[in-house]
Amino acid sequence: MVKNGTRGERDLVKLLWEKGFAAMRAPASGGATKKPLPDIIAGNGEIYLAIEVKTTARERIYIDSEKIGALLRFSDIFGARPYIGIKFRYRDWIFLSPGDLELTPSSNYRLDLDIALERGRDLDEVTGNHRQTRLR
């Protein structure tokens, strides 16, 4: 899964560049440092994004609360919009704000494909290119 996650991050960085954003994978994200770093940092001089990237072949994904907390801390300091970018197999990228996620009894977060499609935004909406009404 790490291999697919890294590939997903690289693919998303490429897509962000194509949308006119300078974008990079954050070095040492994912636990190699104590600093709260997202997987991807991107900006175009007007909009700044901090993105925690997840890829999955399933229709449900779980995210550690520590990752969401770090994303929110970084975004607050940096002045970025925090997003979780999720690539479900055979689907385009879906972006959600941390508030769109469901808290589990163990204080982590869960996201089902149906909820992601209902609440999520596409890449154009996140980058300010148009307003998405729904992904379904």
Swiss-Prot record:
Record note on cofactor: Binds 1 Mg(2+) ion per subunit.
Cofactor(s) named in the record: Mg(2+)
Covalent S-S links between cysteines: none
Residues annotated as site: Transition state stabilizer: K54
Keyword field contains Transmembrane: no
MF terms (GO), sorted A to Z: crossover junction DNA endonuclease activity; DNA binding; magnesium ion binding
Keywords from the named record: DNA damage, DNA recombination, DNA repair, DNA-binding, Endonuclease, Hydrolase, Magnesium, Metal-binding, Nuclease
Matching SUPFAM superfamilies: Restriction endonuclease-like
Family annotation (Pfam families): Hjc
Temperature profile: Optimum temperature is 55 degrees Celsius.
Record carries keyword Nucleus: no
Binding positions (Mg(2+)): E9, D39, E52
Catalysed transformations (reactions): Endonucleolytic cleavage at a junction such as a reciprocal single-stranded crossover between two homologous DNA duplexes (Holliday junction)
pH dependence: Optimum pH is 7.8-9.5.
Enzyme Commission number, as recorded: 3.1.21.10
Gene3D superfamilies with a match to the protein in the record: 3.40.1350.10
GO biological process: DNA recombination; DNA repair
Catalytic residues (UniProt): S29
Description of how the protein assembles with itself and partners: Homodimer.
Function: A structure-specific endonuclease that resolves Holliday junction (HJ) intermediates during genetic recombination. Cleaves 4-way DNA junctions introducing paired nicks in opposing strands, leaving a 5'-terminal phosphate and a 3'-terminal hydroxyl group that are subsequently ligated to produce recombinant products. Cleaves both mobile and immobile junctions. Converts a synthetic Hj to nicked duplex products. Binds a variety of branched DNA structures but linear dsDNA poorly; cleaves only 4-way junctions.
Homology family: Belongs to the Holliday junction resolvase Hjc family.
Protein name (database record): Crossover junction endodeoxyribonuclease Hjc
High-level lineage: Archaea, Methanobacteriati, Methanobacteriota, Methanomada group, Methanobacteria
